[in-house]
């Protein structure tokens, strides 16, 4: 008597093997997606800082003449003065930075945003007034950008969260 087909054990083994392969693939895809998001966000930081430098170049004399006792910032543990502090939103409003991503704000305004999708809301403390910043990622429009002049060269430093590791 010839048997045609597979036994139940063979079918279950095939299903288990396919499940393992699928699981391994989805874990790999998830890790790749996280790496891509981190890379994209770090590129966004470079764009924000470049926009800050352009803004600072246009305001170089103004920045150099700021009162150092009133206009200072701390960058990497070092106090720098004079230093002009602006927000990412200022750079967006003055067209030094652009964004295609938009949200509805105050129920009427079409609001341009820069979104950091590497931030896990569960891993950070969110102040009550920032809750709206976590609709689909973290909106960084309120984050400060420090702009200063050193040796007649304009520098800008993004002060927000870089990327989660």
What are these language model-derived features?
Residues 63-134:
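Extracellular/periplasmic head regions of type IV pilus-like filament subunits
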Residues 112-165:
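Short, surface-exposed interaction loops/tails
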């Amino acid at each position: 008597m010839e048997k045609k087909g597979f036994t139940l054990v063979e079918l279950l083994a095939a299903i288990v093997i396919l499940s393992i392969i699928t699981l391994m693939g989805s874990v790999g895809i998830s890790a790749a997606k996280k790496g891509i998001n981190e890379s994209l966000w770090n590129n966004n930081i470079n764009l924000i800082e470049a926009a800050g430098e352009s803004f600072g170049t246009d305001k170089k004399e103004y920045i150099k003449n700021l009162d150092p006792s009133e206009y200072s910032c701390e960058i990497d543990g070092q106090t720098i003065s004079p230093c002009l502090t602006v927000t990412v939103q200022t750079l967006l409003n003055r067209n030094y930075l652009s964004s295609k991503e938009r949200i509805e704000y105050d129920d009427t305004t079409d609001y341009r945003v820069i979104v950091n999708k590497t931030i896990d809301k569960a891993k950070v403390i969110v102040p009550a007034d920032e809750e709206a910043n976590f609709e689909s990622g973290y909106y960084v429009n309120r984050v400060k950008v420090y702009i200063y002049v050193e040796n007649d060269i304009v520098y800008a430093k993004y002060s927000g969260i870089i990327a989660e590791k």
